[in-house]
Design a protein with these regions (language model features):
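A structural signal for isolated positions on well-ordered beta-strands in alpha/beta enzyme cores
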Residues: 2-4, 33, 84, 120
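Conserved beta-strand termini and adjacent loop/short-helix elements that scaffold enzyme active sites
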Residues: 6, 35-37, 124-126
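N-terminal beta1-alpha1 ligand-phosphate binding loop
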Residues: 2-30
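FMN-binding flavodoxin-like domain, especially the glycine-rich phosphate-binding loop
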Residues: 16, 28, 47, 51-52, ...
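Short, glycine/serine-rich, charged loops/turns that create anion-binding
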Residues: 10-11, 39, 90, 128
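A short beta-strand-loop structural module common to alpha/beta enzyme folds
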Residues: 28-41
Length: 182
């Protein structure tokens, strides 16, 4: 069974998650195919796919335009397939329920906008990658963390919040769903 993973990534965490999903799908007997829609916006939808996993980061209450454009352009190819979607954000790592609810709401709005009704959708906690930010973004991100009560304020370090067990469980659930299709 061939499963396409179409994703977008800015600082690399969504790409890392997509790669982990690919590994978990392989472990389940699937053949994963990866397309980074930011780097390959003209990539075609591979033939004979049995399912689609799509996802990307949530930045400034939006998912990447390149991901939306690619999914919209290939709607006919994935519309009849089992689909799963993942959203990556720092809000998903928040201890505040309102932040988590907001991340869910923005993800659902994105899905509604592109006409996607995935069988499985999740928000994964992302990462705070100070080492990849410029001068201004480092300070903005630090202030956001500080205002939300976070403690990860040392800008000389990166902080990863992704629950890799949750990522692998998501991939396993989707592989089982695709395998159960006639």
């Amino acid at each position: 069974m061939r499963i396409l993973i179409a994703y977008a990534s800015f600082e690399g965490q969504s790409e890392k998650i997509a790669s982990r999903i690919a590994g978990a799908l392989e472990h389940c007997g699937a053949t994963p195919l990866l397309i980074n829609t930011r780097e390959q916006p003209e990539a075609s939808f591979p033939p004979e796919c049995d399912g689609l996993v799509a996802g990307g980061p949530l930045h400034r209450e939006q998912h990447p335009l390149e991901l939306a454009q690619w999914l919209t352009a290939h709607h006919a190819e994935w519309a009849q397939l089992p689909v799963a979607f993942f959203s990556v954000s720092l809000s998903a790592a928040s201890h505040r329920q309102q932040d988590q609810d907001d991340a869910q709401h923005v993800m659902q709005q994105f899905l509604d906008d592109i006409g996607m009704q995935p069988a499985i959708s999740v928000t994964f906690a992302g990462a705070l990658k100070y080492s990849r930010y410029g001068f201004l973004k480092k300070r903005i991100m630090r202030n956001i963390v500080k205002k939300s009560g976070g403690k990860d304020l040392d800008m000389s370090m990166d902080y990863e919040y992704t629950d890799w067990g949750e990522v692998e469980e998501f991939a396993g659930r989707f592989a089982a769903l695709v395998a159960s299709q006639p």
